[in-house]
Amino acid sequence: MGVELYKHNKVAYEKVEKMFEKENRVAVVHPTGSGKSFISLKWLYDNRDKKCLFLAPTLAIRDQLIRHIKSSGLELSDFKNLEFAIYPNFASITDEFLEQHHYDCVVLDEFHRCGATEWSKGINKLLNHNPNIKVLGVSATPIRYLD
């Protein structure tokens, strides 16, 4: 049981794991539809004993990961320490919340959106609260053109 990856994603995942040996923040930049969500899912599964957070820009993208969990033969109950949030809601996160929810790992889906003025507030607070948190950012478009 676990998350099976296509060959090109296995190569990327192995590089992610290698980078996490030296760094706390790693980014995967792959084209749309290439399986970034499955790389995220495998990383969350492999770290399921840790307190993890999956942050997405929309409920639709959050729900997509949940569908991938189920299509991989897993259940949400296999991820007892995983929480979900969306950037708009996380922007107003409080210090008290972060004290009560000490995360070890976070996936930033479409991480380029973290650069948005409002959405970055919660992310910055999270990273400042826990500078040793492992961060996996995934995006097909890592450059923000709207700023």
Where are the model-predicted features located?
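Walker B catalytic acidic pair
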Residues: 109-111
